């Protein structure tokens, strides 16, 4: 049974340290990091047990690295300055892109109800969410980096916190501090002035034991907990993304965690297993797992450069019988934000083209992608993610690639090779590579008229002119008989999402012709591990809608085309359904097919599990 949303409150998650990065870290560390001009109050028993939930106000300037992430001047989440351009926050604060892309970051903030001297507000240029974060398990790797569109000017009220040094860690029992503008009690009011609370770190064994008592137990090796079994002090809603900070031996404040989550606010977890209303410690994600990731991005963010070739010349031409393209020029570089790069590939006339991607690292298809066009500027598909697709056979002598990136993410781009092939099209080519064709033709199963092999997987995409529909006519059909056509079968879709299946065939009876409902038809053939037969052969023809007396509305939407995707491998763009903000330089290119970068391993299919 999942934890109900009103009980699971995302508020706390820790970052600790991995050894072996002293030179790297010292090269980027600000010598004035972790320095506050406000002396901390002496700790006693009562100040130790103060809390944000009903806790104490912070004197202005006490934690100059604390920032407020705001949407239309309303506080949404906290964050922590680690350099003049970089802020750390919680990944779950950035999970909703519609909100994330509208946020501004205010440093030097103290009282939310008024503008104060020393405040600085910057827009966000780049959002980088940890790759292992998932909204389905938001307590894992709940961390994100924000690159500012500008730089903070350091002074009395704006300074960076320190990142931990190699070998530096804070043992169980160490008292650390978290601050924020979160609720003063569970379900209570929001403060206007920054609050703080001191929290002891728990042992790993106690942390794991408490989490296993929950009705929906939580496990993982990334956790570190804070708090007291009797509760009473905690972070709460609105504190997400803020800092858990500890003073090191030199007195400098060091970032030990990022406010992420907890069960309730300040609840007791003593005798938790027998309680109806359970509680949890404040949970932190182990920084030893994410510090190298942080360092990689804040370093490369200062020096990364994409290739200048062709990006400044949108109609850049690459011609010849074969060649390659690396973008950026080195795998160790990252592509820049706000890019619009266009390449036109030309192989000799009357030749076709085979593309192979040897490297692919492009963020979400909503914001960063490589789009492919062919024949009269017609879109073939778009690529993103990290899983490499099979080779792609294009029935054309020219192709245009357009790469677009926005200001939210970056990655290492792509490498591809191209080669001209004589247009000796084989009807079973869809079993050797993803085959995209723009002309009528014949298709057949692998080895036809001999028996097809076990675990075969074949895919053809036909794209007719917009004024045409596509007709599939079988010449023969001999596929292993099974009652529901779930073992060996041919499927026909009028969209590449495979959401609009218009036919499914098996058995030994030649069916009637199939007519698509759009100018796109995807045909796939699959076989399982048991039994084979002769297979099939079919003809593809284009039929004018006018000949069929079918009218076309100017507002008619061509179905979005894509494949079923492994989770996280690709995303789908749909101009009507997409709620994300378009990249700054993205053109309105209408309905787009999205190419699956992980699914199309032609010729062999894995068994069912």
Swiss-Prot record:
* Signal peptide segment: 1-22
Q: In its UniProt record, which GO terms are filed under biological process?
A: fertilization; proteolysis
Instruction: Spell out where the chain is glycosylated.
Output: 104, 356, 415, 530, 549
Residues engaged in binding Ca(2+): 119
Which PROSITE patterns does its entry note? Answer: CUB (PS01180), TRYPSIN_DOM (PS50240), TRYPSIN_HIS (PS00134), TRYPSIN_SER (PS00135)
State the CDD domains in the record. Answer: CUB (cd00041), Tryp_SPc (cd00190)
Annotated spans, Disordered: 580-609
Report where it is expressed, by tissue. Answer: Only expressed in uterus tissue. Expressed in the initial segment (IS) of the caput epididymis, the region most proximal to the testis.
Q: What is its EC number?
A: 3.4.21.-
Alphabetically ordered keywords of this record: Calcium, Disulfide bond, Glycoprotein, Hydrolase, Metal-binding, Protease, Repeat, Secreted, Serine protease, Signal, Zymogen
Q: Which residues form the CUB domain?
A: 311-421, 431-543
Give a yes or no for keyword Metal-binding in this entry.
Answer: yes
A GO molecular function term, named singly, is: metal ion binding
Annotated InterPro entries: CUB_dom, Peptidase_S1_PA, Peptidase_S1_PA_chymotrypsin, Peptidase_S1A, Sperma_CUB_dom_sf, Trypsin_dom, TRYPSIN_HIS, TRYPSIN_SER
Q: What effect does gene inactivation have here?
A: Knockout male mice lacking OVCH2 are sterile.
- State where the protein is found: Secreted
Task: Name the family the entry cites.
Answer: Belongs to the peptidase S1 family.
What is the role of this chain? May be required for sperm ADAM3 processing and consequential sperm fertilizing ability. In vitro, has an endopeptidase activity.
Q: What is this protein called?
A: Ovochymase-2
């Amino acid at each position: 049974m999942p934890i109900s949303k009103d009980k699971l409150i995302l508020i706390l998650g820790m970052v600790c340290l991995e050894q072996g990065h002293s030179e790297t870290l010292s090269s980027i560390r600000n010598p004035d990091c972790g320095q506050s001009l406000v002396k901390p109050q002496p700790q006693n028993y009562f100040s130790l047990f103060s809390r944000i939930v009903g806790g104490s106000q912070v004197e202005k300037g006490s934690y100059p690295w604390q920032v407020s992430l705001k949407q239309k001047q309303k506080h949404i989440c906290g964050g922590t300055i680690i350099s003049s351009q970089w802020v750390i926050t919680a990944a779950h604060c950035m999970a909703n892109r519609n909100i994330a892309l509208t946020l501004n970051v205010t440093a030097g903030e103290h009282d939310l109800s008024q503008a104060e001297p020393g405040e600085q507000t910057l827009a966000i240029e780049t959002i980088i969410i940890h790759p292992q974060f998932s909204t389905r398990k938001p307590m894992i790797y709940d961390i994100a980096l924000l690159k500012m569109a500008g730089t903070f000017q350091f002074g009395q009220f704006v300074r960076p916190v320190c990142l931990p040094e190699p070998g530096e860690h804070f043992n169980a029992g160490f008292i650390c501090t978290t601050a924020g503008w979160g609720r003063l009690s569970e379900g209570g009011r929001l403060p206007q002035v920054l609050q703080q609370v001191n929290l002891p770190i728990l042992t790993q064994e106690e942390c794991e034991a408490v989490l296993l008592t929950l009705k929906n137990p939580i496990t993982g090796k990334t956790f570190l907990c804070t708090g007291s079994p009797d509760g009473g002090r905690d972070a709460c809603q609105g504190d997400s993304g803020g800092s858990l900070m500890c003073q090191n031996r030199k007195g400098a404040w060091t970032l030990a965690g990022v406010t992420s989550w907890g069960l309730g606010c300040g609840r007791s977890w003593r005798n938790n297993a027998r309680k109806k209303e359970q509680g949890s410690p404040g949970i932190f994600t182990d920084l030893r797992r994410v510090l190298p990731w942080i360092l990689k991005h804040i370093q490369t963010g200062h020096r990364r450069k994409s290739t200048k070739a062709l990006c400044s010349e949108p109609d850049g031409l690459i011609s010849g019988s074969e060649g390659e393209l690396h973008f950026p020029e080195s795998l160790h570089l990252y592509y820049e934000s706000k890019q619009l790069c266009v390449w036109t590939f030309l192989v000799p006339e009357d030749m076709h083209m085979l593309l192979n991607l040897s490297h692919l690292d492009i963020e979400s298809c909503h914001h960063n992608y490589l789009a492919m066009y062919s024949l009269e500027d017609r879109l073939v598909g778009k690529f993103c993610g990290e899983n490499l697709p099979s080779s792609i056979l294009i029935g054309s002598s020219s192709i245009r690639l357009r790469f677009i990136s926005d200001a939210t993410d970056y990655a290492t781009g792509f490498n591809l090779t191209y080669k001209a092939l004589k247009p000796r099209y084989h009807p079973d080519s869809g079993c050797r590579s993803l085959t995209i064709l723009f002309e009528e033709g014949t298709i057949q199963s692998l080895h036809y008229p001999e028996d097809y092999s076990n675990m075969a997987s074949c895919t053809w995409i036909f794209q007719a002119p917009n004024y045409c529909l596509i007709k599939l006519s079988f010449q023969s059909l001999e596929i292993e008989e099974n009652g529901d056509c779930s073992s060996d079968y041919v499927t026909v879709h009028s969209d590449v999402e495979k959401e609009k299946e218009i036919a499914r065939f098996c058995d030994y009876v030649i069916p009637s012709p199939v007519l698509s409902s759009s100018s796109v038809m995807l045909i796939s053939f699959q076989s399982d591990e048991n039994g084979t037969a002769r297979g099939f052969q079919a003809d593809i023809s284009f039929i004018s809608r006018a000949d069929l007396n079918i009218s076309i509305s100017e507002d008619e939407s061509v179905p979005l085309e894509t494949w079923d995707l492994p989770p996280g491998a690709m995303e789908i763009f749909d101009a009507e359904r997409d709620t994300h903000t378009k990249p700054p330089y993205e053109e309105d290119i209408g309905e787009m097919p999205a190419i699956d970068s992980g699914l199309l391993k032609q010729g062999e299919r894995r068994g069912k599990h």
